[in-house]
From Swiss-Prot:
This is Bifunctional protein GlmU. Homotrimer. It is found in: Cytoplasm. NCBIfam families: glmU, PRK14353.1. It comes from Rhizobium rhizogenes (strain K84 / ATCC BAA-868) (Agrobacterium radiobacter). GO terms for cellular component: cytoplasm; membrane. Keywords: Acyltransferase, Cell shape, Cell wall biogenesis/degradation, Cytoplasm, Magnesium, Metal-binding, Multifunctional enzyme, Nucleotidyltransferase, Peptidoglycan synthesis, Repeat, Transferase. It is an enzyme of class 2 (transferase).
Length: 453
């Protein structure tokens, strides 16, 4: 029979060092609130339920933590009286009697399921407390994990440690797993006889041992345990996240010429043999198929780029952009909610919004779809193998048929049938010698002005 597990995520801190009007766990990493990153790692740990301990921005934090797939209940911590007190805010959930309890924090967005699974295995092996630790070259103020014969004896805070204990480089991350059947009894024994009058979760190690239980520590990569308390650490974590994800994509077959200049979102999908040139930014909900080419300085969000399609340089794809095989969106072009058909080309200086472009069509430089009338958006439909001349304005709603031509500089306000040629501009007139008259008059005016000074 599988063991049941409750995950308790502590996210009630005041976030004072973040200097922000919102809780720090709502700040994004790779376009997603950091609490959602934590929840994703927890969801991969085969848990039964999750209890979210909230304080500031309680409703917003609860909403951000609801990533789907797991049941999340929010519990309000009215006072900030330490980590032990925070865990007991979820007393109702703990009392349901799970086999395992995992305690995690909402501000460790680089967390993966691997150390959480290791902690659960430690409980399955008969331990009552399993602390997740990490080795570091700079232990500084971290609590030290004191281990003897494979058993965790205590967690010693740096300010209370001896010189020998300060030499220990295995440190407490704050994350731990607790025997769920004993959890309430152990948690209720935590006292607050300390300088701050708070209830510390770390006391569980010695409490469990005093009752004949056993505590151990398991190791995790230091990077996964990186917490966020201020904007500098937020930027540092963003960098670490980006480095990790870029590396994963390159190992999967994606080419990045200058990976350090490419920025990904939490859900960016890029297929094998895609080429990403320098200085490309991906927002959420982007899928790049195998073989696509994204040229330098492009910004892509909410878009799909099929294989053999090319984007950029200096292109922007906004939500709803969908490029078919062999299509091209070139330099200084923007596509929003636009479907670009197979082999179609939007090469230069164009805006395509709320539009469909048929296979093989060519959109000339400077063409725009005029999709907004000041109140509502309207659609433009261009058929297959059509040619839109440069500097044309297509005023939606409008349809242009297959194999149609639109003359350069046209303003198109009515539908154009298939195979038709449409002009939407004044006819050119040539007046011989008129330029000379205009120039001489202008020069005379200029000379008169000089003479008056």
């Amino acid at each position: 029979m599988e063991r049941t597990c409750l995950a308790i995520i502590l996210a009630a801190g005041d976030s004072t060092r973040m200097k922000s009007s919102i809780s720090k766990v709502l700040h994004p990493i790779a376009g997603r609130p950091m609490i959602a990153h934590v929840m994703e790692a927890i969801a991969r740990t085969d848990i039964s339920a999750a209890a979210l301990v909230v304080g500031r921005n309680a409703e917003e934090v609860a909403a951000a933590a609801d990533i789907g797939g797991i049941e999340v209940e929010a519990y309000l911590q009215k006072e900030r009286l330490g980590t032990g007190h925070a865990v007991l805010a979820a007393r109702e959930a703990i009392a349901r009697g799970y086999d395992d309890i995992i305690v995690a924090y909402g501000d460790v967005p680089l967390l993966t399921d691997v150390p959480l699974r290791a902690a659960r295995k430690g409980l399955a092996d008969g331990n009552d407390i399993v602390v997740i630790g990490f080795h570091t070259e700079n232990p500084n103020a971290y609590g030290r994990l004191l281990v003897k014969d494979g058993e965790l004896i205590a967690i010693r805070e740096a300010k209370d440690a001896t010189d020998a204990e300060l030499a220990v480089t295995w440190c407490n991350s704050g994350l731990m797993a607790i025997n769920g059947r004993k959890a309430l009894d152990l948690l209720d024994r935590i006292g607050n006889s300390n300088a701050k009058g708070e209830y510390y979760l770390t006391d569980l190690v010695e409490i469990a041992r005093s009752l004949g239980g056993r505590a151990i520590a398991v190791d995790a990569p230091e990077v996964e345990m990186t917490g966020c308390n201020n904007r500098a650490e937020l930027a540092f974590i963003e960098r670490l996240w980006q480095e990790r994800r870029r590396h994963e994509l390159m190992l999967s077959g994606v080419t990045m010429i200058a990976p350090e200049t490419v920025f990904l979102a939490y859900d960016t999908v890029i297929g094998q043999d895609a080429l990403i040139e320098p200085n490309v930014v991906f927002g959420p909900r982007v899928v790049i198929d195998s073989g696509a080419v994204i040229h330098a300085f492009s910004h892509i969000e909410g878009a799909h780029v099929s294989g053999t399609a090319t984007v950029g340089p200096f292109a922007r794809l906004r939500p709803g952009a969908d490029l078919a095989d062999g299509s091209k969106v070139g330099n200084f072009c923007e596509v929003k909610n636009g479907k670009i058909g197979k082999g179609a080309k939007v090469n230069h200086l164009s805006y395509i919004g709320d539009a469909t472009i048929g296979a093989g069509s060519n959109i000339g430089a400077g063409t725009i779809t005029c999709n907004y009338d000041g109140v509502n958006k309207h659609e433009t439909h261009i058929g297959a193998n059509s040619f839109i001349g440069s500097n044309s304005s297509l005023v939606a709603p409008v349809r242009i048929g297959d194999n149609a031509y639109v003359a350069s500089g046209s303003v198109i306000t009515e539908d154009v049938p298939a195979d038709a040629l449409a002009f939407g501009r004044a006819r050119q007139e040539v007046k011989l010698g008129r330029a000379k008259v205009i120039r001489e008059r202008a020069l005379a005016i200029k000379a008169a002005k000089k003479g008056s000074h």
